[in-house]
Amino acid sequence: MVSLYGGGSWVNYGWELFEHVIDARAASMGNATTGYYYKSPTSSLINPIFSSRSIRDVSITHQSRFAGIVNSDLVSFQLDRNNHSLQFNFLYEGIGQIPDTRSMLLDWGNDGQFGTNDIGEGNGVLDEGERLDIEKLKYFSQHQFGMHGAFVKSFRTFPFGFGMKILSSVINNHSALGIGFDIGLLKKIRIVDIGLVLRNFPASGLIWDNGSIENSFSSFSIGAHHASNINGIKFFVIHSMINCDIGFSNRHIDSQFKSGSLSIDTSFGFEGIYKDRLFFRLGRNNLSSATGGLGIKWNNYGIDYAFLSLNSVAGLGSHHLISLNFSLDWVLEKLYGSR
């Protein structure tokens, strides 16, 4: 660990796979679930303290963004051994058709001929009289694979959630491997659940195949959750939540609040549940994008849908998420029959 974090460069990006690859339920509530346990093995991605709750479900999520250029998948489940629970989340994201323009420039200078060493030749800048060779345009792809494992350990009777994440990144002909840690906790104060998460603690590092090391800064999240009933409406519960993400790397140029390297972004969400069968969700994530979704659950399986309206002046559009949830016992019974 000392060798990993003792050298290398500090970067602002690298571990976003574990932030935006999430299930449809959390996404539709603006990812503001730091203090809200919503009974899914994916919940430990946002706060590892939730891995203490036993749940025998398998969750599968797929999302496609930017007209199919970016595709991601998430598979989540929990294993119970000797009265201890371990939650696992396996993540994948692929980005295809990334243009590589590095060899396109015909950098021959002002006279239009190579080898004359005139002004502008070989300077790497598109000068007057130079052009790009479209036949030399190439494309490459990026693939990221991640594993997030979470468990709970108590210290002096106070439980802490620990998340260990492993990231493998492949960009064109280069690859990297890294490891990071998250710490989370949950405290109930009267009728409000308060969740705290420290991500990438003490830092998360990636080691590339060329020997370079990229260290990522830690960040901090705090969230609150409250459940309430509406008078006159039976079997209907509303969950309200708010979240605040605090970063120290100045990586969000469009943060809601920023001062130097400090950035603060808020998010909130609502979930209405009727008879634990029908789910109605609204929210806004930390990118100020409106979110919403629906869910329906049967005895052994369910489906969640999320809609994210991207807040972008570039007109990149919106995208959708679908999550399928299955009872693990039901799946095993269908595969192997009752024993």
Protein language model regions, located:
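Subset of outer-membrane beta-barrel
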Residues: 4-339
